[in-house]
């Protein structure tokens, strides 16, 4: 018993008799309010604990031979699909021929509404054409290439064949109305029909994981003396409006919390024949989910530059939208982890203890203030 008596001396929470305890309405109000606040803070702490936290780490990128997937969704409200060409090139300026892609071009009217329900698949480096029904012609025919014949191409049975032979020779395709194949297929009429239309380009590219660029530009593209050029003879430079809206542009799959800085970017061309350049720094990223799933993707930063590409009015260049990307030698690794239970427990204890302490101070202040006021009132009555 003596030992228990000595143990009681260490009690930090001495109790008073029930008869000496005073319960007030103010104390009840403070208790209810503090209880609700305590519950709210507890739920907030619980929600925070149930979410995962992401730990970033930085490594040297040692991956080799991987492909880079580029997701594209860009609208050109004043550039018809029949005029628009898309090309992908590597850092040396050579066209990437081993590019896997799945790009589509959707015609849009002047209000941005799709002209047809189905988009047409686009081949890199080619503009959109409509080929005449071959069943109505002699399958064994051999039509003229108008002086552009080559060793491997002796016959040009379609307008596209003629354009291809001209492209190979580096000749400008100036007047399609003088080409029988183009007249038959209604090449000029189609260009005229789409004159006031826009175009949406969407899909993806899979290119080699090296620095390079892809671009959207008017005209037929071809290589001339190892230089990538576009034939703009069919277009007046004053009519090339490269206003564009980038709905989405990313390099790889999305992961939780990713920010693609070019998404929903609207750029209005201040004048005709503008060249827009986006200089992109791609950072390889590995995202490891808490369930063990590994997602290999990329994030990027970007800087934009624009200039007039008309040689008569400004700097040399090609009107269009160019995305020039290079890859960082560093890799970011993002790892999802569960939050610490001890941290959650500490937070809960801090909430409970803090609320009890603050509520006790407020209750004591209210109680003693009320007693002091009551004493003054009683003193005034006696005098």
UniProtKB/Swiss-Prot annotation:
The modification N-acetylmethionine is found at residue 1. It is found in: Endoplasmic reticulum-Golgi intermediate compartment membrane; Golgi apparatus, cis-Golgi network membrane; Endoplasmic reticulum membrane. Its main location: endoplasmic reticulum. The record marks 8 as: Ubiquitinated. Residues 1-25 are annotated as: Required for MARCHF2-mediated degradation. GO terms for biological process: endoplasmic reticulum to Golgi vesicle-mediated transport; retrograde vesicle-mediated transport, Golgi to endoplasmic reticulum. Keywords: Acetylation, Endoplasmic reticulum, ER-Golgi transport, Glycoprotein, Golgi apparatus, Membrane, Phosphoprotein, Transmembrane, Transmembrane helix, Transport. GO terms for cellular component: COPII-coated ER to Golgi transport vesicle; endoplasmic reticulum membrane; endoplasmic reticulum-Golgi intermediate compartment membrane; Golgi membrane. The modification Phosphoserine is found at residue 116. Residues 1-25, 363-383 are cytoplasmic. It is a multi-pass membrane protein. InterPro entries: Erv, Erv_C, Erv_N. Glycans are attached at residue 266. Residues 47-341 are lumenal. The chain crosses the membrane at residues 26-46, 342-362. Pfam families: COPIIcoated_ERV, ERGIC_N. Belongs to the ERGIC family. Forms homodimers. May form a heteromeric complex composed of ERGIC1, ERGIC2 and ERGIC3. Within the complex, the interaction with ERGIC1 is direct. Interacts with ERGIC1/ERGIC32. Interacts with ERGIC2, the interaction is required for the stable expression of both proteins. Interacts with MARCHF2. Interacts with SERPINA1/alpha1-antitrypsin and HP/haptoglobin. Possible role in transport between endoplasmic reticulum and Golgi. Positively regulates trafficking of the secretory proteins alpha1-antitrypsin/SERPINA1 and HP/haptoglobin. This is Endoplasmic reticulum-Golgi intermediate compartment protein 3. It comes from Pongo abelii. The gene is ERGIC3.
């Amino acid at each position: 018993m003596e030992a228990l008596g000595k143990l009681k001396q260490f009690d930090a929470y001495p109790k008073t008799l029930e008869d000496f305890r005073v319960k007030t309405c103010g104390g009840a109000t403070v208790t209810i309010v503090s209880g609700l606040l305590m519950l709210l803070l507890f739920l907030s702490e619980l929600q925070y604990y149930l979410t995962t936290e992401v730990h970033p780490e930085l490594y040297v990128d040692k991956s080799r031979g991987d492909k880079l997937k580029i997701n594209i969704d860009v609208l050109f409200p004043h550039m018809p699909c029949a005029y628009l060409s898309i090309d992908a090139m590597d850092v040396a300026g050579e066209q990437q021929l081993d590019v896997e892609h799945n790009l589509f071009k959707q015609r849009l009217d002047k209000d941005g509404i799709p002209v047809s329900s189905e988009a047409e698949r686009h081949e890199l480096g080619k503009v959109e054409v409509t080929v005449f029904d071959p069943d109505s012609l002699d399958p064994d025919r051999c039509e003229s290439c108008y002086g552009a014949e080559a060793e491997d191409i002796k016959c040009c049975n379609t307008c596209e064949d003629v354009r291809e032979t001209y492209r190979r020779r580096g000749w400008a395709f100036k007047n399609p109305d003088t080409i029988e194949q183009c007249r038959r297929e209604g090449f000029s009429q189609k260009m005229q029909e789409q004159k006031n239309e826009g175009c949406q380009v969407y899909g993806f590219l899979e290119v080699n994981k090296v620095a390079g660029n892809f671009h959207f530009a008017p005209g037929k593209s071809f290589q001339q003396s190892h230089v990538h050029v576009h034939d703009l003879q069919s277009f007046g430079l004053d009519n090339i409006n490269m206003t564009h809206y980038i709905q989405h542009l990313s390099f790889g799959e999305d992961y939780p919390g990713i920010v693609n800085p070019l998404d929903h970017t609207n750029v209005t061309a201040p004048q005709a024949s503008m060249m827009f350049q986006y200089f992109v720094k791609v950072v390889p990223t590995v995202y490891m989910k808490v369930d063990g799933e590994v997602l290999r993707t990329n994030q990027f930063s970007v800087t934009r530059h624009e200039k007039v590409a008309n040689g008569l009015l400004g700097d040399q260049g090609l009107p269009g939208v160019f995305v020039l990307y290079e890859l960082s030698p560093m890799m970011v690794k993002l790892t999802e982890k569960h939050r610490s239970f001890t941290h959650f427990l500490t937070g809960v204890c801090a909430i409970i203890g803090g609320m009890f302490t603050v509520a006790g101070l407020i209750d004591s202040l209210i109680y003693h203030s009320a007693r002091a006021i009551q004493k003054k009132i009683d003193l005034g009555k006696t005098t």
